Swiss-Prot record:
One BP term from GO: translation
Self-association state and partner proteins as the record states: Part of the 30S ribosomal subunit. Contacts proteins S9 and S11.
Organism per entry: Helicobacter pylori (strain Shi470)
Record Pfam families: Ribosomal_S7
Alphabetically ordered keywords of this record: Ribonucleoprotein, Ribosomal protein, RNA-binding, rRNA-binding, tRNA-binding
Gene Ontology CC, one term: small ribosomal subunit
Protein family according to the UniProt entry: Belongs to the universal ribosomal protein uS7 family.
Superkingdom of origin: Bacteria
PANTHER family with a match to the protein in the record: RIBOSOMAL PROTEIN S7
Protein name: Small ribosomal subunit protein uS7
Amino acid sequence: MRRRKAPVREVLGDPVYGNKVVTKFINKMMYDGKKSVAEKIIYKAFNKIEEKSGEKGIEVFEKALERVRPLVEVRSRRVGGATYQVPVEVRASRQQSLSIRWILEATRKRNERMMVDRLANELMDAASDKGAAFKKKEDVHKMAEANKAFAHYRW
């Protein structure tokens, strides 16, 4: 275990848009350190979104992240031999990382042939309140709503 808390390193903006969230998305998408491949996929997906919908790719991306962002989630809490699913609010940084993770998971599960098409379609779906990533957020919110009775077990 480390002696001190690790400092949070500042993320630089991506090369095209200068956006830190896009950089985080690229880093999460990357496999085996192949950042250039991940960047190409994302920028091509943004171009494809512009062709299909006429909106700017980065705007659709930001709207999709906003729509998939969870406000509450459930955490397991053990009380007297019973485990309760306790609803808790989600920190802003975790909201962002969860939305990125869920969009990528949903993208990888889609059945289009090319990753560019999968990502573009999932981002457009999420921006318009559809798709697997948005459904995941809805499920998490429903779970928190169903377990509202245990909210007093918060820590």
